[in-house]
Amino acid sequence: MKLTALHFYKYSEPFKSQIVTPKVTLTHRDCLFIELIDDKGNAYFGECNAFQTDWYDHETIASVKHVIEQWFEDNRNKSFETYEAALKLVDSLENTPAARATIVMALYQMFHVLPSFSVAYGATASGLSNKQLESLKATKPTRIKLKWTPQIMHQIRVLRELDFHFQLVIDANESLDRQDFTQLQLLAREQVLYIEEPFKDISMLDEVADGTIPPIALDEKATSLLDIINLIELYNVKVVVLKPFRLGGIDKVQTAIDTLKSHGAKVVIGGMYEYGLSRYFTAMLARKGDYPGDVTPAGYYFEQDVVAHSGILKEGRLEFRPPLVDITQLQPY
């Protein structure tokens, strides 16, 4: 098998409700897709999770495109016959995990039969608009992740009025400081499953007495398996959010899941406001998580998607089928 051609595509859809995070407000999701063609004419797609700007991570759509262009020129027409051999082709991309993850998503499909399956539904609420509340009422997720705002306690009270049981998670995106210690201590009374990344400087955890704030989860700092193990051994970290784009791809996450469980850590698979192709693989990995991952039903964030019926809500779970990318919706890039 050889790779003979590479095509780039752009796709953008408005969010049904703008995404309000501690770092940025998003109105649209711009996304890069790649299409790898093999010597038999088969096409395999990868969806990049990087954003247009570096608000979340230093890798952006433009930087990933540049890296993949160069990678393809270095590997065009090289022969490989196994998944393991294909992964050797991306050894040079260890320092650009978002680019590596995009390629690995396509390579994985060359050597694996993609299954149909179902997973628990884990919603993310950002800003808690009336439209989001109505969506939560209608879909009844197993887990709700609430993005931190100064109104966090009020928003939790609003969520507690919903007429179904759910696990509550808070995501702070490294935005808190010492002045937020009191709020964090109040959260400990709210049966919060865990809080993702409260502090930019993780050493601030040394200033907090054990048990006085919710359990801490790594997310932004979960950049490599070695770094993760070091942090869970140094600090009282119980949960790790694993994201393929941050670790370097599906294979890296699969290895990390097994290793971290052997260290006694709980694992969650994180999403990236994805379209249907990437959402399928996030859901596939989330089957091995200890808590519901960031997996939402088709139509939760966007009216349109390049993969139809990616995550159909049925009896409280999301059903996934092998994804088929509608290339007619993609714009050459």
From Swiss-Prot:
Residues the entry annotates as binding Mg(2+): 171, 196, 219
Any GO molecular function: O-succinylbenzoate synthase activity
Catalysed reactions, as listed in the record: (1R,6R)-6-hydroxy-2-succinyl-cyclohexa-2,4-diene-1-carboxylate = 2-succinylbenzoate + H2O
Enzyme Commission (EC) number: 4.2.1.113
Top-level taxon of origin: Bacteria
InterPro entries in the record: Enolase-like_C_sf (IPR036849), Enolase-like_N (IPR029017), Enolase_C-like (IPR029065), MenC (IPR047585), OSBS/NAAAR (IPR010197)
Protein keywords: Lyase, Magnesium, Menaquinone biosynthesis, Metal-binding
Matches recorded under SUPFAM superfamilies: Enolase C-terminal domain-like, Enolase N-terminal domain-like
Pathway(s) annotated for this protein in UniProt: Quinol/quinone metabolism; 1,4-dihydroxy-2-naphthoate biosynthesis; 1,4-dihydroxy-2-naphthoate from chorismate: step 4/7; Quinol/quinone metabolism; menaquinone biosynthesis
Description of how the protein assembles with itself and partners: Monomer.
Function recorded in the entry: Converts 2-succinyl-6-hydroxy-2,4-cyclohexadiene-1-carboxylate (SHCHC) to 2-succinylbenzoate (OSB). Does not show N-succinylamino acid racemase (NSAR) activity with N-succinyl-L-phenylglycine as substrate.
The family this protein is said to belong to: Belongs to the mandelate racemase/muconate lactonizing enzyme family. MenC type 2 subfamily.
Protein name: o-succinylbenzoate synthase
Gene name for this UniProt entry: menC
